[in-house]
Amino acid sequence: MSGFENLNTDFYQTSYSIDDQSQQSYDYGGSGGPYSKQYAGYDYSQQGRFVPPDMMQPQQPYTGQIYQPTQAYTPASPQPFYGNNFEDEPPLLEELGINFDHIWQKTLTVLHPLKVADGSIMNETDLAGPMVFCLAFGATLLLAGKIQFGYVYGISAIGCLGMFCLLNLMSMTGVSFGCVASVLGYCLLPMILLSSFAVIFSLQGMVGIILTAGIIGWCSFSASKIFISALAMEGQQLLVAYPCALLYGVFALISVF
């Protein structure tokens, strides 16, 4: 115990006072504190109010004019999807490839075998007229009591395919399948007249045979003339007319019997 008391006496100096230490350590506002000289001029009443540097500049006088940007944004006008004007668009029939003027010219070319055919018009792929003529041919057969729509379309497809292969072998320029179908379909028009006669009287006599032969020659001559004009096959009309006569002969047999 005597040693412990000596240790405590040595640890604390005789001149040490706790009151003096606390006064020296926490006396920040006094003149003797370590922070009194550094923060003596700081005003604590301004604490919490921050002023940006831009606000310290003097304000510009108001001139009465609203601020206007130098370059205004002008949105681009939307482009119409269907063009500038609907009146400039082609008609719907023309977009579908149906031209009544060309249909009429081709029909007149078939009805007048001696008329010179326009190769530029005949080389077009126009299936509107041939479809109408095929339906008319089947309708006249129906009036005669013959339901032969399947035979008409089947023979037409086989005949167009055969003529397509033959003309591509004979011509130098070549021909499309649509052009062949268009020409053969238009030249079916005289065959409609033959089937119409079959509604009125029988074609199994001598008059019917002569009329049938004339109609076959008419159809084959018109088709061969158009093919020669469209494909520039001068001097080969008889070679083209022969397979055409075979095709239209089958249609004539359907009309007669």
UniProtKB/Swiss-Prot annotation:
Transmembrane spans: 125-145, 147-167, 174-194, 197-217, 237-257
Main localisation, per the record? Answer: endoplasmic reticulum
InterPro entries per record: Yip1/4-like, Yip1_dom
Q: Which domain of life is it from?
A: Eukaryota
Under Pfam families, the record lists: Yip1 (PF04893)
Topological type in the membrane: Multi-pass membrane protein
Q: Which GO terms describe its cellular component?
A: COPII-coated ER to Golgi transport vesicle; endoplasmic reticulum; endoplasmic reticulum exit site; endoplasmic reticulum membrane; Golgi apparatus; intracellular membrane-bounded organelle; nucleoplasm; trans-Golgi network
Q: Which residues lie on this side of the membrane: Cytoplasmic?
A: 1-124, 168-173, 218-236
Q: Which region ranges are annotated with the description Interaction with Sec23?
A: 75-106
Q: How does it assemble?
A: Interacts with the COPII coat components Sec23 (SEC23A and/or SEC23B) and Sec24 (SEC24A and/or SEC24B). Interacts with YIF1A. May interact with RAB1A. Interacts with YIPF3 and YIPF4.
> Linked disorder?
Microcephaly, epilepsy, and diabetes syndrome 2: An autosomal recessive disorder characterized by neonatal or early-onset diabetes, severe microcephaly, and epilepsy.
What this protein is called in its record is Protein YIPF5
